[in-house]
UniProtKB/Swiss-Prot annotation:
This is Non-selective voltage-gated ion channel VDAC1. GO terms for cellular component: membrane; membrane raft; mitochondrial membrane; mitochondrial nucleoid; mitochondrial outer membrane; mitochondrial permeability transition pore complex; mitochondrion; plasma membrane. It comes from Rattus norvegicus. The chain crosses the membrane at residues 26-35, 39-47, 54-64, 69-76, 80-89, 95-104, 111-120, 123-130, 137-145, 150-158, 163-175, 178-185, 189-198, 202-211, 218-227, 231-238, 242-251, 254-263, 273-282. Gene3D superfamilies: Porin. NAD(+) binds at L242, I243, G244, S260, A261, L262, L263, D264. Non-selective voltage-gated ion channel that mediates the transport of anions and cations through the mitochondrion outer membrane and plasma membrane. The channel at the outer mitochondrial membrane allows diffusion of small hydrophilic molecules; in the plasma membrane it is involved in cell volume regulation and apoptosis. It adopts an open conformation at low or zero membrane potential and a closed conformation at potentials above 30-40 mV. The open state has a weak anion selectivity whereas the closed state is cation-selective.
Amino acid sequence: MAVPPTYADLGKSARDVFTKGYGFGLIKLDLKTKSENGLEFTSSGSANTETTKVNGSLETKYRWTEYGLTFTEKWNTDNTLGTEITVEDQLARGLKLTFDSSFSPNTGKKNAKIKTGYKREHINLGCDVDFDIAGPSIRGALVLGYEGWLAGYQMNFETSKSRVTQSNFAVGYKTDEFQLHTNVNDGTEFGGSIYQKVNKKLETAVNLAWTAGNSNTRFGIAAKYQVDPDACFSAKVNNSSLIGLGYTQTLKPGIKLTLSALLDGKNVNAGGHKLGLGLEFQA
């Protein structure tokens, strides 16, 4: 097996089938450009059709490939400024170091994180330190992989409380066409997902989750069908009879349109359904 994914990316293929291609209740516009010197600009804006709240963000990224460095600057409409510096494969092959900081001029709130990651065949390690006024917190994760089998552990230790505040386990199996993922969070949250690539055009996923002491099980199925190279259709439904539909069309190279709708299957004629519209420009 190649390098296993990070803990956060375990079960990602199934999650993508459930989440990508939808934007319920939002009108969204994304713009991505790249200059000749390698400077990348990404801007995003969205308006919530229910609350009419408008959010926006701007990100600039520059990669200094020769030294394995990436510089990122971020800003959003909450007036939060962020800076991220990443160095990869320089101190050691497979080692990635990131310094992430943010500052809100309105509130004076500051935040800083140091993220480390190390990956090689059969293993993926991660350790993040979040510097907070109350005291630093340490998040560590480990994923092991062998012949398609994956096992991972994630924990969060808060120095202010001197104890582990989060402890998560995951086990799974992965091939190019099939993925199985199960997880237990803090011994109370249980979940599982199955991803199946039926053929070149059709992808399906099943998701299951429940909480200890609660008989309510959450269940959902989803599918994505690539109609042609420029269009795809997505659909999903859960045990609450919420039906999600999405359609993505590439209008021309660099311009993509996404339409989505969330329907209440129990009250189809009652209204209250959510619609979404997204436009993405890339140059």
